[in-house]
Amino acid sequence: MVDTTRLTRAVDHFADRLRAAPQSRLQRNGAAEALALARELARRAQLLEAPGVEPREMPDAGMFAAADQITVAVHDLALVLVDEGQVADAVRLVEEAQKRAGV
């Protein structure tokens, strides 16, 4: 089993920043970036769990749910990652999304 602590910490930090962000920041780009990240993390988890099956898209639950969506998606992904390269790639995605979100 691979250590995913770096990944879950990165997402927890991003989620905390989203929860603390003003509504105006979420509306500008914070929530959209978080949703895009959650969808990508969920897609990757589904592809690892069921190769060859078309992944389902995570629904948009609204800007105030964005932090929860990335948290759920990363925990699902963390359960199926098999090597450090996958963890590092996912951490990079989280860090880039947080920068674009401006939080």
List each model region and its residues.
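Short terminal alpha-helical segments
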Residues: M1-A42, V94, Q98-R100
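Intrinsically disordered or highly flexible coil/loop and linker segments, enriched in small
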Residues: A20-Q27, L47-E54, V103
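Amphipathic protein-protein interaction modules
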Residues: Q46-V82
